[in-house]
Amino acid sequence: MATLLSHPQQRPPFLRQAIKIRRRRVRDLQDPPPQMAPEIQPPSHHFSPEQRALLYEDALYTVLHRLGHPEPNHVTEASELLRYLQEAFHVEPEEHQQTLQRVRELEKPIFCLKATVKQAKGILGKDVSGFSDPYCLLGIEQGVGVPGGSPGSRHRQKAVVRHTIPEEETHRTQVITQTLNPVWDETFILEFEDITNASFHLDMWDLDTVESVRQKLGELTDLHGLRRIFKEARKDKGQDDFLGNVVLRLQDLRCREDQWYPLEPRTETYPDRGQCHLQFQLIHKRRATSASRSQPSYTVHLHLLQQLVSHEVTQHEAGSTSWDGSLSPQAATVLFLHATQKDLSDFHQSMAQWLAYSRLYQSLEFPSSCLLHPITSIEYQWIQGRLKAEQQEELAASFSSLLTYGLSLIRRFRSVFPLSVSDSPARLQSLLRVLVQMCKMKAFGELCPNTAPLPQLVTEALQTGTTEWFHLKQQHHQPMVQGIPEAGKALLGLVQDVIGDLHQCQRTWDKIFHNTLKIHLFSMAFRELQWLVAKRVQDHTTVVGDVVSPEMGESLFQLYISLKELCQLRMSSSERDGVLALDNFHRWFQPAIPSWLQKTYNEALARVQRAVQMDELVPLGELTKHSTSAVDLSTCFAQISHTARQLDWPDPEEAFMITVKFVEDTCRLALVYCSLIKARARELSSGQKDQGQAANMLCVVVNDMEQLRLVIGKLPAQLAWEALEQRVGAVLEQGQLQNTLHAQLQSALAGLGHEIRTGVRTLAEQLEVGIAKHIQKLVGVRESVLPEDAILPLMKFLEVELCYMNTNLVQENFSSLLTLLWTHTLTVLVEAAASQRSSSLASNRLKIALQNLEICFHAEGCGLPPKALHTATFQALQRDLELQAASSRELIRKYFCSRIQQQAETTSEELGAVTVKASYRASEQKLRVELLSASSLLPLDSNGSSDPFVQLTLEPRHEFPELAARETQKHKKDLHPLFDETFEFLVPAEPCRKAGACLLLTVLDYDTLGADDLEGEAFLPLREVPGLSGSEEPGEVPQTRLPLTYPAPNGDPILQLLEGRKGDREAQVFVRLRRHRAKQASQHALRPAP
């Protein structure tokens, strides 16, 4: 599509319409922009008044002397055609009438019928051989009409050409021998005067030559041929046979006809005589117009075509529509009549169309696809040497002109085909296709042999155009006020325009040029533009210098980011592996790094301060328990991470230091936020009398800190530490990244953890007071109140408070609070248990409270896990309360359970051992004990020996109150006595099966003067005695060897509990006995058994 309008002097070129250039001096460029290539001035499509008058005369003459029926889509009325010509030539009515009258007075042309006899098929075979030797006689009969009106209803004509048309006006074709389907393809020009009473006659004859009978019999093939011989014998010798005729009225013909006509007979004999293919064209000879007399017909038609197409395009522009290449019916009719009357060949018509369209395309706006049809027609009909020398020069000039103009459009394709217009890509692609097809033509190769290949020409045009476009953009971005900041902003705008242009080349234009010409526009444009950009950026950074202000730093950062984006386009070009001017461009920005980092921190700090100041410390919603400042802080940190990713500094060592700075600033901001948010909480709660509101704010503060800790924990992923570690692996010492970045992160997390724990500790302290009060009340409740009822106030208090905290704290902080409360609760319970050691009732309440508190803090898996609940303190308290809540007899039983366990674990016989056999006979309810012996007893007498005996008692005594203790015989001076004595105890089996039930064997050294000395004790559990574990009577009873043990010298916890129960006589008796035994054991130097 052309871009120059009809009058370059009146309307500015399209290029200057698309890009408004600011005219000002360029002072800050060291290299002036190159001189722009001059715009191609296309040849004017307007004619001089004299030329237009001659052409108008010839066009009117064509309409006035129209011949034949109109074509189906053509205009019938001459007045309409004359009116159209008046508009197309912009002729005033008066001038039109004068010219029309003058044309009417001109001499009429000689009317001619150009008849071409192409061929025939299916004609009659008149010769003996079954074939004919056909030829045609044709001419025009003047003054006699053809009856019947139309050709379809005419009667058969018995008259023949030789009888109706003078011989000098009769034309004859060649004779085609021996065929039924002759081909002539001969053309004849037949003149006539009046089309209304003229008719075309064509007779087809079979040439008859004189042959002998012998020759004819030799050609005989069947009986039908024999009949022909007899018929010819009756005919005069040398008389030709009639094959058929075609008679047409000229006024029934169109300007051009191309049809098959049936051959009509003179009689009813053989009505089907075949068909004849005829072509007709009604033409003029000796036209009286000045243009026809002075100029070749081809030239006149070319000018007429150019004038009418120009008018068609202008009419569409006036209606704000684009011409699609279709001529109006009026224009098509006039051009068809003119070409027909001038007898222009199809080739010359195509050539005229090409010359006219190629000229008009350079000055009017219409689709370049209109050029494809004449190109194709010329290529199809091209024959070398067909054109005269001047026509060849004209055609070569049109090729050269269109190629030059097309290249100028391609050079300026960014402005000529803007993407803001939807059909621009299609228009450019159409232009390229036209140029490709033109350069591939045989005519182009012969007439323009020295033209460089089209891809080379287009590539050079694109390179030049890209450079010109860059300099135009550079001028467009020149600031009104000269200065370094303004120059930086202008350069940034220029780089962004370059990036946008490259994106357009990549997405749209590259595909068009590659598919059409195999040219990679994007790679070429990237190579050219990156070099131009690199030079200007380097010059600018040099002017800025090493001291970078905050304002200049922001400008340089945006410029750096834009250059990164520009360099990333390298991967899409063919230059990805080459050396580019923008390689290592980051070095030009090194002085600006401190300014960038400081500005990033300052902006983030200001945003944090602003966010905290506007925070009302209210949760964002039911599911979001932190406040607005936490969200703003997360966004702030995300922006810092985004800035770090944008920076993505190429140098590994410097990138590491930049990352260290980012992490340091982020951690510092986190701690600053903690201080600010706590101060904000104090500010908001200072005037609050409602402690619940203060607790709410404290919960929000703690949640905000927890949210901050989660955000900080994502720093390694957001700043891509793993990728950084791989990059700096060859530069830094091993472990340096871990020691630096991770140490900073852990320090910040530790600080946040401390702040969170402090906040949670404050919340816990508010609850701990209430927990301690309820536990104290629990201990002091009346004895008549059931334990389950006594703990209700404590449990309700915890339910309300913990539900509140669970609602207002995030899960992590709520778990931390539960841990603190649980630890404190255990501490309070331990203190209460210690103060109530002597009260089994109070201890039982505490025991039940501990069980319920464990369930409460576990909360069916929603609270603390069992591992966190079952601490050492909990387990010790649980054991202590289990003991304290027990009765005296239960404690005595537990004591014996403990001694039985001690007996089972003792393997050393340093105190000696006793051997017994015990069994139980359920039928007799008798426990039978055989005390066999003792061995390795300690010598307790001064003589180095002992007088041992064994005391047997069933314990606990409250289970066996009726059974008295038994004793063995005393053995003098014997450390290995053999007792061999049997004892029977009448006792039911049930008490013997209870836990703690045992046979206590106390080995004593008999002392005549004083109290007996204790050798040791042994405990035989009764539930293990044969006969008690089952219903069967015991058989062979095994011996049991029991090492002797001492009671613990420091006292037993159970004995201490029993000792504290002063009012329980049974407990006091038991304690005195066990204390006496412990005292006896402590008098010996040997260490007691563990």
Swiss-Prot record:
CDD domains reported for this sequence: C2A_Munc13-like, C2B_Munc13-like
Topology in membrane: Peripheral membrane protein
Known cofactor(s): Ca(2+)
Keywords: Calcium, Cytoplasm, Endosome, Exocytosis, Familial hemophagocytic lymphohistiocytosis, Lysosome, Membrane, Metal-binding, Phosphoprotein, Repeat
Domain MHD1: 557-677
MHD2 domain residues: 788-895
One example of a Gene Ontology biological process annotation: phagocytosis
Start and end residues of each C2 domain: 92-239, 910-1035
Gene3D superfamilies, per the entry: 1.10.357.50, 1.20.58.1100, C2 domain (2.60.40.150)
Ranges for region Interaction with RAB27A: 240-543
UniProt cross-references to Pfam families, sorted A to Z: C2, MUN
Tissue: Expressed at high levels in spleen, thymus and leukocytes. Also expressed in lung and placenta, and at very low levels in brain, heart, skeletal muscle and kidney. Expressed in cytotoxic T-lymphocytes (CTL) and mast cells.
Keyword ATP-binding recorded: no
Residues noted as binding Ca(2+) 2 in the record, renumbered to the chain: D941, D947, D1005, D1007
Cross-referenced PROSITE patterns: C2, MHD1, MHD2
Cellular localisation: Cytoplasm; Membrane; Late endosome; Recycling endosome
Domain of life: Eukaryota
Molecular function GO labels: metal ion binding; small GTPase binding
GO CC annotations, alphabetized: azurophil granule lumen; cytosol; exocytic vesicle; extracellular region; intracellular membrane-bounded organelle; late endosome; lysosome; membrane
Comment text on domains: The MHD1 and MHD2 domains mediate localization on recycling endosomes and lysosome.
Involvement in disease: Hemophagocytic lymphohistiocytosis, familial, 3: A rare disorder characterized by immune dysregulation with hypercytokinemia, defective function of natural killer cell, and massive infiltration of several organs by activated lymphocytes and macrophages. The clinical features of the disease include fever, hepatosplenomegaly, cytopenia, and less frequently neurological abnormalities ranging from irritability and hypotonia to seizures, cranial nerve deficits and ataxia.
Family to which the UniProt record says this protein belongs: Belongs to the unc-13 family.
Protein name: Protein unc-13 homolog D
